[in-house]
């Protein structure tokens, strides 16, 4: 909702101040003012940043500074640059996100690229992953981005290798099953699912616990040290048992 009338802006600012509620100013390519569009020609990063700071100035006139800025674009490079400009020009908290990112597959890729690039440079305070998918998957994706960047410590860091000629187990099925069953595990651990015993324990020696496939069987290892050998159909259960012990 866009409120520009001075009296209405003051009323909103006063009400939020009395209740200790921050105001998030959300800008996207479809919300830009005609004057700003005329100046830049199209929704550039500069246009998004100018619009957000303009709306912030409307609140600042009434001494309201409990503000969060959001400048979302469906183009990752535009979104990144807009937030970089805002970080240079103000000290307000920034809410990161790629708007209209798309379906689960492409949306996660675009959100990870945009949000991740900014967080790696210390830009951003809150995030939102927008997907044309089950909203629960948006939450999972957001947590996964934070875990991948070592910002969030709660939950499993899951690693698995691509299949190769040495793989003799159904690695894809096993990896998906393990990831799904550990999705809500809150332990700060790294779990590995590797395709072969030749490289598995060595490549994933930093994992707290892991499995490596053989021919109809596999090894369970901990910090690169082999614990035991189990049949392929028992690999997942054996791994989960070891996770419970950690």
Model-found features: residue ranges?
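Catalytic alpha/beta core domains of metabolic enzymes, predominantly
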Residues: 28, 36-183
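Short amphipathic alpha-helices and their capping/turn segments at secondary-structure boundaries
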Residues: 6-23
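Nucleotide-binding motor/catalytic cores of P-loop/tubulin-like NTPases across gene-expression machines
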Residues: 197-226
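Beta-strand/loop-dominated core regions that host nucleotide or nucleotide-derived cofactor-binding catalytic loops
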Residues: 215-221, 225-246
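Conserved, mostly hydrophobic/aromatic
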Residues: 25, 69, 118, 161, ...
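Hydrophobic alpha-helical bundle architecture
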Residues: 174-201, 205
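Conserved small/polar residues in nucleotide/adenosyl-binding loops
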Residues: 1-5
